[in-house]
Every structure is written in C-alpha cells, then in structure tokens.
C-alpha cells in the first residue's frame, strides 16, 4: 500500500505526489486518510505526481494530507445483497437500512464482452405503449434511447416503461440515476415499494447536487451490478435477463465535460470533452447481451435546446437499437406520450422480425402521417376546402392516428385522474390497421384521444353522439 501526499486541489481535481517507485496505475482508487473521500487516478503527470478526480466533495481537503493507494479500481458490492437497496457511486448504502450484505465486489472498470460472446437481439419486448410498440418496437436485450428536450416527458415515459416492463418482467432490474433530481429518485423508490417489486431492483444514485466525479462514475457502478446478474451463472449454468434503466445519459457526458477542462484537456466542439465518443463507447459497449444472459437497457437522453445534432445526443444515437424521439410540437397539442412517430426508429422494423402485418401497418401509418405533414403548409394558407377528396381523407385519418397514439399512463393517474391503459401489441396493430383501412372514417377524431384499444374509441364516440 503506497502512500502519497496531496500537492494541489482545483475544484474536483486533486494532484497527489507518490514516491517514484510506487506510482499508482490509471483508474486506481486512492483513499484520503481520516476522511471519507475516494480519489480516482486519471493521469500520470510524471515525477511521481498523479492527477485524480474526487468522488465526493473536496471541501476540507488540504495540501500534505496523506492519500493511500488501494491498489485496485473503485469496487462496488454486487449480487443479491444489492437488491432492494439504494447505493451511491461507491456502493455505500444511502437508504439508512444498514450495510449492503453483498457476497462479492467487482471493479467498475471492466472490459466489454468479446465479439464471440455477444448474441444478437431479435425477440420483441412488448411495452403496452401503442406508439412505441407499433412504430419503434424494442428488442429483448437491445438498447433503447428516449430522446427529448426539457419537460417533454422523458422521465414519465421511463417510469411508465418501468411500470409496464419491470413489473411484468420476472427478472431483475438496475436503476442508475445519473445527475437527475433527487425527488425523482425518491418517487421511483416509493413506486417500486408500493408495487412490491423492490426486492428485484437495485438502485444507484448520483444526483444533480453531487460533485462531477460521482456523476461521471455512477453509470458504471449501476452497469457493473447489472453485468454481475447477467454473467453470474445459476444452477442451470445460465445468467439472468436484466433490465438496466439509466436516467439520464446526457448528465454522464456533462460530468465528463465538467472535469475535462480541469484535467487540462482542450475542449472540442460546443465545449465538450475531446474524448466524448470514446467515453460514450466505453460505457455503451459494455451494455450488451451475451450467450449467457441479456441486458435490456432503456436510457433517457436529454437533448440540449431540442437540437438532436448536438454532439452529445448525436454520439449516443450510434449505439442504440431503438430511438424514441419526444417532440415539443406534439406535446403542445396535448398528445402524450409526445413521441414523434416519423422521427423514432428501430432496427427491429423488419418484416422478418416483427411479421408482415405489423410492418405493413406501421409503414402505412407512417405514409399517412408524412402526407399530412406535407399538406400542413397548404392547409395553413388555403384551408381544408382547397384539398382534393383523397387528401381530405388522408388528413382526417392522420389526425385520428395522431390522437390514437395518445394514451393514459399508469404513473400519471395521480395528475390526470384517468386510469392507465396497457394495450397488447395485437390490439394496437388491429386498431391502426382499421384506421388506415378507413373502417372508422365516420367517427369524430376526438373519440380517439386518450383511450386504450380501438373498442374504447368506438365506445367514446357513442357517448359523444348521445351527449350531442
């Protein structure tokens, strides 16, 4: 155990000098004596000096304090003992329920599974949310990104997916709260507790008020716990299927940006760290499914100023199997979930994977919506009356489709007062197929707003007719 002493402190970055023959390796964890603070080595500057990031507040640190090299990277508890617990970036419990009774601890910096060990994802994962199941279906063992600006519903969508998938899914879940609001973390804990699935969820939080070092590493802590569940073989020699929820991946990038300049790196485009693509790749390449078990990850991605070409969301796009793009213009119409069906994509959109009926219905829905989008300018200038009969019909169907994409959420019951709806995939396909086939051309578009299946829309239309 070599010892060094602190020689410089700049915000979250601390320089420590060691004897030349015992300089720590990059990513080694150092413990500052008589404090709770852990430092992670980022660079070797020469002459025995290493530059580190503090995982915790550097208040109270001073020069010449002794830092001890632990000789290994940051290690966190893994295994069944983490389930039902809330931990911080170092795996320490923050739920006041005593120490974490874990049988093992793993380092958070690990290699991604080799190419031979990985297995492709083709099995569909039903979410019960119409617009997602139809337009950008998820794969079991795939990676999903929820893209959206501030206040368009990323976290609510994430919570609904957790509600619909994690509760129905018999496997285990890991939730990593990266730089988000503490209130949301608290809400999530109580949501899980109330629905009696807390004993299947491990929670790791590094919230907005934490120093950048914590926010930069907390995603890796959560991922390491998920990897353990995936890789640890049970009596049948198989790992588990794990759900990994990350809210929010953008804050991971942002924490890297905050420490990058302090580490002496030149900023790149828009002030991001020059290592942005590599940092994102290191995290994303580990979130994958192997022949042993699977990790299905759902990540919320904040889009700064609603600009999808910003380097951070643009870098994230490359790693995902499905992208769900939330649109402010759709949210402003009062249609929730505010998913943009023309901007959301999925690699599963292949007739050989999802079946011909699903694929054809989705394509026709997309064509109808695209036609409506093109006609919007004409409608704005000349009005609906100038359109041909065929175009009027397309517009009418597109508006019904838009409204039918809305649906009441279980997690929003408290605010909306209407009970949440889970719509099975076959009902979703049947409903949209009927709309594009013109079976419901006679119903008013308002009947399709905030309902579950197509039967509810028909029922709502009847009630509206009776009132009229």
Curated annotation (Swiss-Prot):
Signal sequence range: none
Q: Which UniProt keywords apply?
A: ATP synthesis, ATP-binding, Cell membrane, CF(1), Hydrogen ion transport, Ion transport, Membrane, Nucleotide-binding, Translocase, Transport
The family database entries (NCBIfam families) matched by this protein are listed as:
atpD
SMART domains (UniProt xref): AAA
**Reactions catalysed according to its record:** ATP + H2O + 4 H(+)(in) = ADP + phosphate + 5 H(+)(out)
Sum up the protein's function in the record's words: Produces ATP from ADP in the presence of a proton gradient across the membrane. The catalytic sites are hosted primarily by the beta subunits.
Q: Which GO terms describe its molecular function?
A: ATP binding; ATP hydrolysis activity; proton-transporting ATP synthase activity, rotational mechanism
Cited SUPFAM superfamilies:
C-terminal domain of alpha and beta subunits of F1 ATP synthase (SSF47917), N-terminal domain of alpha and beta subunits of F1 ATP synthase (SSF50615), P-loop containing nucleoside triphosphate hydrolases (SSF52540)
Q: What is this protein called?
A: ATP synthase subunit beta
- Give me the Gene Ontology terms describing cellular component: plasma membrane; proton-transporting ATP synthase complex
State the annotated membrane topology for this chain.
Peripheral membrane protein
Which source organism does the UniProt entry give?
A: Stenotrophomonas maltophilia (strain K279a)
The yes or no answer to whether the keyword Cell membrane is present is yes
Q: How does it assemble?
A: F-type ATPases have 2 components, CF(1) - the catalytic core - and CF(0) - the membrane proton channel. CF(1) has five subunits: alpha(3), beta(3), gamma(1), delta(1), epsilon(1). CF(0) has three main subunits: a(1), b(2) and c(9-12). The alpha and beta chains form an alternating ring which encloses part of the gamma chain. CF(1) is attached to CF(0) by a central stalk formed by the gamma and epsilon chains, while a peripheral stalk is formed by the delta and b chains.
Q: What is its EC number?
A: 7.1.2.2
Identify the domain of life.
Bacteria
Q: Which family does it belong to?
A: Belongs to the ATPase alpha/beta chains family.
* Gene name of this polypeptide: atpD
Subcellular location, record wording: Cell membrane
The record lists ATP as bound by 148-155
């Amino acid at each position: 155990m070599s010892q060094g002493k602190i020689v410089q402190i700049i915000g979250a970055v601390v320089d420590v000098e060691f004897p030349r023959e015992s300089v720590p390796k990059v990513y080694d964890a150092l413990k500052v004596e008589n404090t709770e603070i852990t430092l992670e080595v980022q660079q070797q500057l020469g002459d025995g000096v290493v530059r580190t990031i503090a995982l915790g507040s550097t208040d109270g640190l001073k020069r010449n304090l002794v830092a001890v090299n632990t000789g290994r990277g940051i290690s966190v508890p893994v295994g069944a003992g983490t389930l039902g617990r809330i931990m911080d970036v170092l795996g320490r419990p923050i739920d006041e329920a005593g120490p974490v009774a874990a049988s093992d601890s793993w380092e958070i910096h690990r290699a991604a599974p080799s190419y031979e060990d990985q297995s492709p994802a083709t099995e569909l994962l039903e979410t019960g949310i119409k617009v997602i199941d139809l337009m950008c279906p998820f794969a079991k063992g795939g990676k999903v990104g929820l893209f959206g600006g501030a206040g368009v519903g990323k976290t609510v969508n994430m919570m609904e997916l957790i509600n619909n998938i994690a509760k129905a899914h018999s496997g285990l879940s890991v939730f990593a709260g990266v730089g988000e609001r503490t209130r949301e973390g608290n809400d999530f804990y109580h949501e899980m507790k109330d629905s009696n699935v807390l004993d299947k969820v491990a929670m790791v939080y590094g919230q907005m008020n934490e120093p950048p070092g914590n926010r930069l590493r907390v995603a890796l802590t959560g991922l390491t716990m998920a990897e353990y569940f995936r890789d640890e073989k049970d009596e049948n020699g198989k790992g588990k299927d794990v759900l990994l929820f990350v809210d929010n991946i953008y804050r991971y990038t942002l924490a890297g940006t905050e420490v990058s300049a302090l580490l002496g790196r030149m900023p790149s485009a828009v002030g991001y760290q020059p290592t942005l693509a590599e940092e994102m790749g290191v995290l994303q390449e580990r979130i994958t499914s192997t022949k042993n078990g699977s990790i299905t990850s759902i990540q919320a991605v904040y889009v700064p100023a609603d600009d999808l070409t910003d380097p951070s969301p643009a870098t994230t796009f490359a790693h995902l199997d499905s992208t769900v793009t939330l649109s402010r213009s759709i949210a402003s119409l009062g249609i929730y979930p505010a998913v943009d069906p023309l901007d959301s994509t999925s690699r599963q959109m292949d007739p050989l994977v999802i079946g011909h009926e699903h694929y054809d219905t989705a394509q026709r829905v997309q064509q109808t919506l695209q036609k409506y989008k093109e006609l919007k300018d004409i409608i704005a200038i000349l009005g609906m009356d100038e359109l041909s009969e065929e175009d009027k019909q397309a517009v009418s169907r597109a508006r019904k489709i838009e409204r039918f994409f809305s649906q009441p959420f279980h997690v929003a019951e408290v605010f909306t007062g209407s009970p949440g709806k889970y719509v099975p995939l076959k009902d979703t396909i049947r409903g949209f197929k009927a709309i594009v086939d013109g079976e419901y051309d006679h119903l008013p578009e308002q009947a399709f707003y905030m309902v579950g299946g197509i039967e509810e829309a028909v029922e709502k239309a009847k009630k509206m007719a009776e009132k009229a």
